[in-house]
A protein has these predicted regions:
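Active-site hotspot residues in diverse enzymes, especially metal/ion-binding acidic/histidine motifs
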Residues: 1-198
Length: 198
């Protein structure tokens, strides 16, 4: 269990948020904002919501998604992290994309876990692509993954691309079959991978 929120029945009552004390500070930080987002977005006075690590069959997946996105935006506003990602992306090359290093850096900056950072980078893949492609930060279109799918937009996250690069190098180390230079292409990102792994 991550936390519980009790939404007040009326203005005379207080909302209540309970967090799992066995979780670390950074986990409680995120879960607290997750529960706060429920208070701000669930319009059902008197409701109690129990939040677990994964959405359970009896939970509304949209409400949980909204609370996760809300907590991430409270703690790591996209207008703050996109410039950091762009600055860090200048160090990416054909041999490495140190997304996991970036995750550690952002984790420390925003007092959240690296998992939260990686989920945020993944959920902002389309927005990151827009920003890295030169779109002004105030003109970026925010769009859920389901909306992207409806519109035929398919953008690999930077984490996915780094994992593909890692897998290619791992396979080379295991088989010693030379890697042919190739490109990772995902409609929007193009990264060249050389025949050498570092």
């Amino acid at each position: 269990m991550r936390g519980i929120v009790r939404i007040a029945k009326n203005r005379d009552e207080n909302h209540v948020i309970l967090l799992n004390e066995n979780k670390s500070f950074v986990e409680q930080n995120y879960h607290g904002f997750h529960e706060l987002t429920h208070i701000l977005t669930v319009d059902e006075p008197g409701t109690t919501l129990n939040c677990f690590g994964n959405t359970r069959p009896n939970q509304n997946s949209y409400i949980e998604w909204l609370a996760n996105e809300g907590a991430a935006e409270f703690l790591m506003p996209y207008k703050e992290i996109l410039p950091i990602i762009r600055n860090e992306s200048k160090t990416f090359d054909e041999h490495s994309m140190p997304i996991f290093d970036l995750s550690e850096k952002l984790s420390n900056m925003y007092n959240v876990s690296t998992v939260v950072v990686q989920n945020r980078i993944s959920s902002l893949s389309y927005e990151i692509w827009q920003y890295l492609s030169g779109t002004d930060i105030d003109k970026i279109q925010l769009m859920s993954h389901s909306e992207q799918q409806r519109k035929g937009i398919n953008v690999d996250s930077l984490l996915d691309i780094e994992n593909k690069m890692f897998d290619a190098c791992w396979n080379y180390e295991q088989t010693k079959v030379p890697i042919k230079p190739f490109f990772f292409y995902s409609k929007y990102y193009i990264f060249a991978v050389s025949s050498r792994c570092y």
